Regions:
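Periodic low-complexity repeat segments enriched in small/acidic residues
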Residues: 1-61
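Divalent-cation
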Residues: 56-225, 230-234
Length: 235
């Protein structure tokens, strides 16, 4: 994970649906994520491991099925799930949202995990933990952590597992209870099951926007500096 600058604290919230939901149990815990040569505290709400004694290894059949599910995702699957017209509408909603607060919202849609993460999932680490690390990696690559008020938020959608994570920088996460993040993620998770990505992403965006307006409203005469690109990221 390549996070530059000072160590930043973020809250990662995962709500699994579909195949992932059958493999994990909800817990609340605290972990550490390497940030260059420093560490940032990460609060995890949701499902972080399989039920029982925490055994990470899974059957060869299950591991193989996941591998093929990810590798057989159609070319440009992210663009098909969120086509250009939908992406433009989502970008317009982000633009409108950021006229009301000083935060930054980034939407990232990824078709499948890369091979190195697929190999680790269920063998070296639980699948939800691998997905969480992937979301945190995008949080760093897209520089969502690098905002003036530490109030950037990443909404990350992994199509192959139909699951979502919201990663928020410390400026906003310290103001917002876990229950609020869970509600935002659940709103998207319910629509993922039916493939209604537009409605789900819009609802999640509205939830995040409302929290940013509440805690980081723009004052009279102020303008959002738009520190990060508002276009949907297809990965």
């Amino acid at each position: 994970m390549l996070w530059g600058g000072a160590a930043r604290a973020a809250v990662a919230v995962i709500f699994p649906v579909g195949a992932v939901a059958q493999e994990v149990t909800p817990v609340v815990g605290v972990g550490l994520v390497a940030v260059g040569f420093r560490r940032a505290a990460v609060v995890i709400l949701g499902a972080v491991g399989p039920p029982g004694d925490g055994e990470m290894r899974e059957s060869l059949m299950a591991h193989g099925a996941r591998w093929w599910r990810h590798r057989w995702m159609p070319e440009h699957a992210a663009e098909r799930a969120v086509p250009p017209a939908m992406a433009e509408q989502l970008q317009a909603r982000v633009n409108a949202s950021e006229t009301r607060h000083s935060g930054e919202i980034v939407l990232c849609v990824e078709a499948a995990l890369p091979n190195r993460d697929l190999w680790r999932a269920g063998r070296e680490a639980p699948l939800p933990a691998v997905i969480r690390e992937r979301a945190l990696s995008w949080f760093g690559k897209l520089r969502v952590w690098d905002t003036e008020h530490n109030n950037g938020v990443l909404i990350y959608l992994l199509l192959a597992e139909r699951c979502v994570e919201i990663v928020a920088d410390r400026g906003i996460s310290r103001h917002v209870p876990d229950a609020h993040w869970q509600a935002a993620v659940q709103a998207l998770g319910q629509h993922l099951q039916t493939g209604d990505f537009d409605t789900g992403l819009t609802q999640a965006l509205q939830e995040v926007s409302a929290l940013l307006v509440q805690h980081f409203p723009l004052q009279a005469g102020e303008a959002n500096p738009n520190e990060l690109c508002n276009r949907v990221v297809w990965a």
